Curated annotation (Swiss-Prot):
<dbReference type="InterPro" id="IPR013114">
    <property type="entry name" value="FabA_FabZ"/>
</dbReference>
<keyword id="KW-0444">Lipid biosynthesis</keyword>
<keyword id="KW-0413">Isomerase</keyword>
<keyword id="KW-0963">Cytoplasm</keyword>
<comment type="function">
    <text>Necessary for the introduction of cis unsaturation into fatty acids. Catalyzes the dehydration of (3R)-3-hydroxydecanoyl-ACP to E-(2)-decenoyl-ACP and then its isomerization to Z-(3)-decenoyl-ACP. Can catalyze the dehydratase reaction for beta-hydroxyacyl-ACPs with saturated chain lengths up to 16:0, being most active on intermediate chain length.</text>
</comment>
<dbReference type="InterPro" id="IPR029069">
    <property type="entry name" value="HotDog_dom_sf"/>
</dbReference>
<keyword id="KW-0276">Fatty acid metabolism</keyword>
<dbReference type="GO" id="GO:0019171">
    <property type="term" value="F:(3R)-hydroxyacyl-[acyl-carrier-protein] dehydratase activity"/>
</dbReference>
<keyword id="KW-0443">Lipid metabolism</keyword>
<dbReference type="GO" id="GO:0006636">
    <property type="term" value="P:unsaturated fatty acid biosynthetic process"/>
</dbReference>
<comment type="subunit">
    <text>Homodimer.</text>
</comment>
<dbReference type="InterPro" id="IPR010083">
    <property type="entry name" value="FabA"/>
</dbReference>
<keyword id="KW-0275">Fatty acid biosynthesis</keyword>
<comment type="pathway">
    <text>Lipid metabolism; fatty acid biosynthesis.</text>
</comment>
<protein>
    <recommendedName>
        <fullName>3-hydroxydecanoyl-[acyl-carrier-protein] dehydratase</fullName>
        <ecNumber>4.2.1.59</ecNumber>
        <ecNumber>5.3.3.14</ecNumber>
    </recommendedName>
</protein>
<dbReference type="GO" id="GO:0034017">
    <property type="term" value="F:trans-2-decenoyl-acyl-carrier-protein isomerase activity"/>
</dbReference>
<comment type="similarity">
    <text>Belongs to the thioester dehydratase family. FabA subfamily.</text>
</comment>
Length: 171
């Protein structure tokens, strides 16, 4: 059976409940912490390193929850939410490839913020290039990523690391 190469919001929410990739595969967060509305493309051999890529989007509207509290009279999307979306996508990629377990962010090499997401923006686009995939006792993905708002790059991150664990009780 061929794997899907794009996903809707409904499918991503189903992933958060264990109903898309399978019950033992990494899950996405749901509700407010799911920072992705759709995956436009996902593949195992594309991207800058030929090891996979993901392009995903988040629709921006003035009524998103974080604009009411970050900050009063100066609404801006928290940078950490964009970074978390990148980690979410690396974990999703590993589950899409077949990894089983629970995903955990393990770190990032460097993050740069050169812009902001304001309530009048329309769309955030995440672009991830998978650099390395480890599928042994340790399952880990490493990626470089950018985040654009309305076509302008405003975040970049190198060496985003996500691990997949069968037991997180001692993590």
């Amino acid at each position: 059976m061929e794997k899907a190469n794009s996903f809707t919001k409904e499918q991503l929410v189903a992933c958060g409940h264990g109903n898309l990739l399978g019950p033992n595969r990494p899950r996405l967060p749901v509700d407010n912490m799911l920072m992705i509305d759709r995956i436009i493309t996902i593949n195992e051999d594309g991207g800058a390193f030929g090891k996979g890529e993901i392009i995903a989007e988040l629709d921006i509207t003035p009524d998103l929850w974080f604009f009411d509290c970050h900050f009063i009279s100066d609404p801006v999307m928290p940078g950490c939410l964009g970074l978390d979306a990148m980690w979410q996508l690396v974990g999703f990629f590993l589950g899409w490839e077949g990894a089983e377990g629970k995903g955990r962010a393990l770190g990032v090499g460097e993050v740069k913020f050169t812009g902001q997401v304001l309530p009048d923006a329309k769309k955030v686009t995440y672009k991830l290039n998978i650099k390395r995939k480890i599928h042994r006792k340790l399952v880990m993905g490493i990626a470089d990523a950018t985040m654009e708002v309305d076509g302008r790059q405003i975040y970049s991150a190198t060496d985003l690391k996500v691990g997949i664990f069968s037991d997180t009780s001692t993590f």
